[in-house]
UniProtKB/Swiss-Prot annotation:
It catalyses: an alkanesulfonate + FMNH2 + O2 = an aldehyde + FMN + sulfite + H2O + 2 H(+). It comes from Cronobacter sakazakii (strain ATCC BAA-894) (Enterobacter sakazakii). It is an enzyme of class 1 (oxidoreductase). Coiled coil: none annotated. Belongs to the SsuD family. GO terms for molecular function: alkanesulfonate monooxygenase activity. FMNH(2) which is absolutely required for this enzymatic reaction, is provided by SsuE. This is Alkanesulfonate monooxygenase.
Amino acid sequence: MSLNLFWFLPTHGDGHYLGSDAGARPVDHGYLQQIAQAADRLGFTGVLIPTGRSCEDAWLVAASMIPVTQRLKFLVALRPSVVSPTVAARQAATLDRLSNGRALFNLVTGSDPQELAGDGVFLDHTARYEASAEFTRVWRRLLEGEKVDFEGKHIKVRGAQLLFPPVQQPRPPLYFGGSSDVAQDLAAEQVDLYLTWGEPPEQVKEKIAQVRAKAAAHGRTVRFGIRLHVIVRETTEEAWQAADRLIAHLDDETIAKAQAAFARQDSVGQQRMAALHGGRRDQLEISPNLWAGVGLVRGGAGTALVGDGPTVAARINEYAALGIDSFILSGYPHLEEAYRVGEFLFPHLDVAIPDVPQPRPLTAQGEAVANEFIPRRVAQS
């Protein structure tokens, strides 16, 4: 099975060390462009662009990278409860059209009540997933060309429609990650690819089995992906030295503050990440070549595969054997590590190198009439 390998645009900052401004690097448009172009040339399928108050806006960053890349896809966040499904569908179709079919979408419900309150969202965990499920039903139907009337507990639309369809048909793929029961229910019913953070293989195997069973109950199948950091070097010894250097400037106070911030979140996935290391730095190899040091201070994905190319490839193939076909990777600093992954890891994997998409002609049309419909040619009698 050919694997889809993604990279990451660090719009929330980058550098040589975690939890310190030592070795930090300005993240401006030029730097993000360098990373995107490196990923494009090396053969990564796409890039994940993060979302949240600590990040630049993912949609604007993705749009700015379209003209400077050829085949790279952009995985950007859909934010239920922050934007209406109709507006989000319109934005999604436009991004897909502007990129000639290179848009992918990642449903993000949010996990930090404090940050969500700042965005005007005051729903609890269960209610957020209810709202996300309603949002996704409307969003999918609109992109698939339906005119939608919908009234739910959280969302109500009447006569919603898109005049300009996406390039990808029936619609661009929808990604989603969540470890709670309600999250898995949503994934099973509506998404195309279920994402997990980099837990040990046995835990990932259990989650995949749960989502597969729930999807089968809906008569559906779901693809699977995993989010991991990577520290790959010419030798495994060098890789572990690089892992140690990454947290060399971390002190106990910084770790404690980070873990306290994570503890206020209601994300089951974040709780599972924190449990892998318990805030301690003395037992960070939690599974062969799987290192939890990143999660001491980084929210979300907190584990890294560490080793030389053949070793990391073997671990990736262990996950692939569980049914995972997409790997969203990253490393610090992201420009240099993109090249290390391309040079040291890619030769040992069956990587699905994307083709350069050919321009797809769009149907000729005049200006929308009364902002309501597209004019059609009238047959002459």
